[in-house]
Amino acid sequence: MNYKLLERDARLGDYHAKKRLEQRMEQLETLSIRDALGYPLTYAPSALPAQLLADIDKMYDNISVTSIDTEVSIEEESFHSCRIEGATTTIDELFDIFKAKRTEKKGDRMILNTYRAVKYLNITSRRDVDTLVQLWKIVTDGVCDNAGLSGEKFRSGNVVVGTHEAPDVELLDYCMKQFFDFCHGENISHPYTKAAILHFYFVYMHPFCDGNGRISRLLTTDFLIHSGLENFSALTLSKTINETSAAYYQALENSENNFHDVTPFIQY
């Protein structure tokens, strides 16, 4: 049953709906971060089996990183992240964008903005709401869709993305404070798991009128790097998401509708 419908029925006094919620919660670990209805997100600690984590760690250790690798990765990450958002720029055009700072097309500007956002994160030690707002300004500079919904910090109106209706504007300050409290505070067994939870929550909240996808991917890689996994600076997360977009969006939907159990997205 859909999470939201079950939640509604339980609130209306449906005994069976309430029992199903309770039984589900017994199988999961509760997180400190809460959804728009005030219920905590949950996940299965066994979402990533020990052997899978060991295999991932082994592959990670085999990654060789140079400054050239990192620079190329930033350029390619910016490219693939913006392709997800509809940029039509081709891989062969990247040289003109980065060397000549070409911004003739909207997609070119999107890519250059995303590149600059990564560079901004690299020289900024703070990870808080002020940094997030500045990151959004860089990402959407000159290419902001839905600018009419831009508020002082976050979006000023409600938005619907596909089947997802983002939480009300009034909740954004509180929920984004939760986001950073969780990011800096809660101890999760593995950075991969915590990165997935943070990514899901940011996309779920959709705090800005535009640029949320690009920012969520930037923050995910940034979190992993600052968790001691520096070799992720040479990887291109957005390329993988772009190539498996159907599974990515299905995992997001499953986690939202399945009691806000983030396990499906962690496993993705």
Positions of the model-derived regions?
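FIC/Doc superfamily catalytic core
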Residues: 1-268
